[in-house]
Amino acid sequence: MSEYKETLNLLQTPFPMKGDLPRREPALVERWAAQRVYARMRAAAAGRPPFVLHDGPPYANGDIHIGHAVNKVLKDIVLKSRFAAGYDAQWIPGWDCHGMPIEHRIEQLHGRGLPPAAVQRLCREYAFEQTERQRRDFLRLGLLGDWPHAFRTMDFRTEANELRFLERIRARGLLYRGQKPVNWCVDCQSALAEAELEYARKTSVAIHAGLRVRDPVDFASRFRRRPVLDKPAMLVVWTTTPWTIPGNAAAGVRADAPYGLYDTPGALIVVAQPLADALFASLGVDHALCALARGRELVGLALGQPFFAGRDVPVVEAEFVTLDAGTGIVHLAPAHGAEDAELCRRLGIAGENVVDGAGRFAADLPEIGGLPLADGIARIVAKLRADGTLVREAAFEHAYPHCWRHKTPILFRSTPQWFIGMDIECEQGEADPGRAAVTEEAGATGEARKVGKAEEAEEAGPAKTLRASARDAIADVPFYPPSARQRMEAMIDGRPDWCVSRQRTWGVPLPYFVRRDDRSLHPRSARLVEAVAARVERDGIAAWSRLRPAELGVDENAYEKLSDTLDVWFDSGSIHATVYRDAARADTGGYPADLYLEGADQHRGWFGASLMTGCAADGRAPFRAILTHGFVVDGAGRKMSKSLGNTVSPQRIADTRGADILRLWIASTDYAAEMSISDEILERVVETYRRMRNTLRFLLQNVADFDPRDDAVPAGQLLDVDRYALARCREFVDACRSAYARYDFVAVTRLAHGYCAEELGGFYLDALKDRLYASVADGVERRAAQTALHSVLANLLISIAPILSFTAEEAWTVFAGDERDSVFLHTWDEHAPPPDDAALARWAHVRALRPHVTKALEEARGAALIGRSSEAELVVRAPRDVLDALAPLHGELAAVFIVAGVTLETADQIAVAVARTPLARCERCWRHEPSVAAHASGDALCARCRHALSRRARAERSEPRAAVGSR
């Protein structure tokens, strides 16, 4: 064949076998930006059904990490696949910019004590720098989106709209001021939301402490026995927060639980009977049960406060007492526990903070005032021991909430804060803050009271609590994976009132004026908030910092403005009010968003915050579906940690292997679970990528001289195997569309790899090679094959483009011959071939027969009967119904099986016999053909090759032509 090689249709392509992705990809990033590809996608999609993907904004601080990459690439895959499916797919990226981490960073760089205006200016500058830095990293991953209009929560308009949105919630009666225990970080010097907590192992000092009985006679009567005066009697509590002992205000018991009175060497001790054996075993003391009483019989008993000798505390019924650990008697400190506070509020029992905002004991506490927590705990324990009320002290390891930023344990302490109430009933329907003027304010005990009156919202539904509204709002929302629904429901059911106020400088202010005497809101709050919002929209949050109440007609002697800022989760959780509903961006269309997509930790984070703000303002969720992805772990299943040295940089992967390798790993990994990554795993991804790239290269080579406008063959002139290939292409497209639509990207990668390796590489392309290489270059047989390949290639590229974005675009540029064109401007509906069930049915018999043929050929090679399959003639024996199906395809079977000939015979079962062909071999195409005869050159050529050479010679004589393969 060597002397005929130049006469074959062996075409070239500028699409190389080696991807060299780290070098090629950055140029495509620049091209997409310069050519405004996303904007052109939106323009091309005008009038199509909208699909809105709302971005949960990452925090604008530091380099992006592998979790960011997973999140953003998944969103990009969704966006591009929805466009390919015929939607006007929209994604506006953004950043979360306010909050403690940035303010803390500015304090590190510039020191504390700066005036608020300076802090806000420096924070804004720093946040902007961080967003630009992260933007570059995100773009490097191939993300398309509305980057020119990316949002930042610190944008003036966004800040202003957040104020307006908060006022809508207040107008529905859900915002109130209360004195409640909140999560408090001594380093942040601020309250924290549940979503700002991380749970880590902590070893605490746990104590069993006795609360002495004040009246032995009353005590004895409750156990129906005579008083015992020779020993002190104590109810024993167990706590892992001994620092709260000075704040003890009551002891809680379970009403129906049995409590035993036990005689021990040093005292009479009362604990829940089911827990007594374990307790006394840990103490190692002898004990004897003297009497029993139900918890309800102990209610009202007076006990001595364990820290303050002259103070009494009562025994109360507490429904949250359990009998699975401890003593069955709970130490209640209403200033330092949510359940304690609520119970004591109902009972009229006041509580006092024993720790200040810096984590030191209150200055007025005897013996421990002003001490750091650890020192004070030691003195409390020593005092209890000296008083004879310390029953046991031990180290206790448990999961404890820590500040997500400082990694330090938080405190629970009562502070005046602003809350969105989860269980306050309000009318359903969108509130009109211009007509309504209602709020809630809570007194020192946390009880909410009305301070205004709400006018009914138009078309208001029945009153519901925010908790109930949130539950109803997600009832019909699909979750991916479905198990994520339970997490969201658990978040709703267990969520306390949302503390939305913070004591920081860099944040959106609570835009209210309160009376100096009773802290009630100004009666004109609705109009005042709009006036403040107008100023913030012009000048940012600095406008509030420098605003004097008198400028808005507020009596400064009677009112003062709040100094609190809003929780950053309220910032990001309310961003839907600006990004997709703001009149300035009315072109986005579609609210609620079609999809929210974030990590598994966002059920109590952004998912939860968005759900609560949407329901609080409008009574509905701001999303139609939720997709949750898992965290990234290393190859051994360990979480990423700098201390373990197992972190993986997405930038490094992009710079060494290519962003498409990272994208393919993300798509081929089940996001519903933890996502493992390592060099070994990435190497396997590279192998998958190479297979698909080689398939693309083969396809591009073999359509290099094909122009569908001039060369396409009508469907009626296609060979049946080409029609079958197009039918299988349509099945592949439909399967990909379905998998993308249900966000099953693992299925897409399997489909694409299987299509390249098995359907194309393992069947159709093998069957085509002879026709492509040896047939007349512009003959119908070859053009028919190219017609099918052109469609296959277009649909394959559109199908893999959401995942292998760089590679698909590189290939499309070669395929289209136009750098201005982009694969992302095309849809399946434009290119997918029509379904052809008849072709699929015909060729199902061929595909079923193929394994029998392959096995027979392998056995013939093993017996040295043949070398190449082209030297074989087959006798296919099969039942009549199979032969009837194969008969119309008989003329194509030899090419499909790559043999010299096929004979069909009837038999009861399928069997394939192989014989060596006696036919001569063509020296050009290497087929064994009856038409092989001597050529003028002296070589033996088949009739097809003689015709091809003759056509080629005439063409060369008639006019000079470019080398075969040029466009």
Swiss-Prot record:
Q: List where the motif 'KMSKS' region lies.
A: 639-643
- Report residues binding Zn(2+): 922, 925, 942, 945
* Name this protein carries in UniProt: Isoleucine--tRNA ligase 2
* Annotated cofactor note: Binds 1 zinc ion per subunit.
Q: How does it assemble?
A: Monomer.
Residue interval(s) of motif 'HIGH' region: 58-68
What is the protein's known function? Catalyzes the attachment of isoleucine to tRNA(Ile). As IleRS can inadvertently accommodate and process structurally similar amino acids such as valine, to avoid such errors it has two additional distinct tRNA(Ile)-dependent editing activities. One activity is designated as 'pretransfer' editing and involves the hydrolysis of activated Val-AMP. The other activity is designated 'posttransfer' editing and involves deacylation of mischarged Val-tRNA(Ile).
Q: What is known of its domains?
A: IleRS has two distinct active sites: one for aminoacylation and one for editing. The misactivated valine is translocated from the active site to the editing site, which sterically excludes the correctly activated isoleucine. The single editing site contains two valyl binding pockets, one specific for each substrate (Val-AMP or Val-tRNA(Ile)).
Q: Which Gene3D superfamilies match?
A: 1.10.730.20, HUPs, Valyl/Leucyl/Isoleucyl-tRNA synthetase, editing domain
Superkingdom of this entry's organism? Bacteria
Q: Which UniProt keywords apply?
A: Aminoacyl-tRNA synthetase, ATP-binding, Cytoplasm, Ligase, Metal-binding, Nucleotide-binding, Protein biosynthesis, Zinc
Q: Which reaction does it catalyse?
A: tRNA(Ile) + L-isoleucine + ATP = L-isoleucyl-tRNA(Ile) + AMP + diphosphate
Q: Which Pfam families match?
A: Anticodon_1 (PF08264), tRNA-synt_1 (PF00133), zf-FPG_IleRS (PF06827)
The cross-references to CDD domains, in alphabetical order and at most eight, read:
Anticodon_Ia_Ile_BEm
Give the binding site residues for ATP.
Answer: 642
Q: Which gene encodes it?
A: ileS2
User: What family does the database annotate?
Assistant: Belongs to the class-I aminoacyl-tRNA synthetase family. IleS type 1 subfamily.
